[in-house]
Structure formats: structure tokens, C-alpha cells
Amino acid sequence: MKAERIEQILLIHLLATAILAVLAFGTVESWSLVIFEINALVMAVMMGLLQLVDDDFQWRRLRFSLPLWALLLWGLIQLAPFGIAAPAGGPVDAPPESLSLAQLRLPTISKDPQSTREVVARLLALAIYFTVALQVFRCSAARRLAVRVLAVFGLAISFLAIAQRLTWNGRLYWVRQVSAFVSPFGPYGNYNHFAGMVELLFPLPFAWLIFSRGRGGERILYAIAVVIMVTAAVLSMSRAGMLTIGVQLAFFAGAAFLHRRRQGGGPRLTPLLIVVGAVLLSLWIGYQPLLRRFGTIQQ
């Protein structure tokens, strides 16, 4: 019972982190990164507690996270000191023994140890989150909950992004002033980042629409979520985002066709209706800007 409770807390914690990381302007600033990394350490402690109370806990279930941990290990190796210490300050010709520790620099594989340390810290946090996800999403009920939560969140944040674009006053969330040198969209300071978020979110409800036979109300909600998310990504004017989403939609259309042909299931017109809906809504909201943007894709 304790193990189930801890897993439920981890699941809610993980989904809340995914949502808040987006809302915090994409978690690219120092304050949000610190919270993101400390939060990962808290989840690591909870995973340790889960291992202690769960008799069925098996680390081999988490083996898919090994590439991330291997990459983290490579980052640590790049920070490992080797060779003879060199002066980092003071007279260049001074003998090392006459310098303090603050004036010595130990050679490392990394040419920029400070940047490497920052990346290693972020990679550690991401590895922890991914490992937790592998543990909590073993259950099909948890996966269904994640699809519902992320689909509704994707719908809400995309609707907010469209509304913010139509009523843009030079401020994120209509409150925070942004520099004239950035190109924000939604909660992000870079429209390409918003498009990247949509590329990750909209396949979840879209795949559910194609491969699952759910209730009518849920299907309508997911279809609306996909249309709004794709529309928001198109209106972000991210050329790479448009091309990537186009490839994703083509892939899902092919998957839907094969699914229908092999198993005789799945709604035949779902991908086509979603594409048509997203295109029409995008043209209705931003016809002229889209034409200008498509004219620059060849560049």
C-alpha cells in the first residue's frame, strides 16, 4: 500500500513538473532551472523510498534509461582533472607551488568546464525524471491519465498562445515585458520552442484517436486538442515546426491507413479531418502572415 501511494505521488509530481516547466517560460532562466533541478533530487529521494518499501521493485525495468546515464557519465569524465595543474591567474611564469588553489586550473577534457558542469546538472535532472517516468508509466491507467492530462494541457496552452498572439501587447501572459530582440509565442521567449513543445504533445491524443476505440465525448475532446495544438504551432510561424508537424501528420495518416487495412479498426477519416480543420482554422486566423512566412521557407 505504501508503494502504491508513493507511485501515485510520483505520477502526480511528474505531470505537475511537466506542466509547470512549460508555464515557467519554458524553464530557461536561472531561477526556474534551479527549482527544476532541486525538484529532480526530491523525486530521486522518493524513488529511493519506493525501492525500500516495494518488494517487487526491479531496476531492470529501468534499463531504457541507461543511455542517458551513460551520457551523464561521459559528461563527468570530461570534468575529471588530469595532468599537471596550470596557473589560472597571477604571473604566468610563477611555479605552481607558489600559487593558491584559486589560482590553479586543473586540465580537463572539456574546453569549457563551467558550461559542461551546467549541462551535466541539467542532464542529471532529466535522467532522474526519465527514470521516474519509466517506473510510474508501467501501469496502463497511469499512461491513460498522462495522455488525458497532457492533451488537456496542450489544448489550454495552445489556446492561450493563440489568444496572446491575437491580443499581443509586448508582454508574456500580458504581464511580463520582453525584449525587442526575442520572438515570443505562448509562454516561450522563442517561437521555435513552442512549436517543439507541440511536436511532442499532439502525437499523444492523435495516436489515441487512431488506435483506440474510446467514448464519443473523449474522442471529440482529443480531436479538438489536436486541431488547436497544430493550429497554434502553425501560427507560431516556425518554419521548422511546420515542416516537422507536416511529416508527423503524414506519418500518422500512413499509420491510420495500415491500421485500418490490417485490423479493420480505427476511424478512416480522422487524420484527414484533423488536417483540414487545422489548415482552415490557421488560414482563418492568420491568412496574410502565413502566406508571407511560407514564401520564406525556400530560403
PLM regions and their residue ranges:
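Alpha-helical transmembrane segments of multi-pass inner-membrane proteins
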Residues: 1-27, 34-48, 68-72, 76-82, ...
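Extracytoplasmic catalytic/substrate-binding loops of multi-pass membrane glycan-assembly enzymes
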Residues: 299
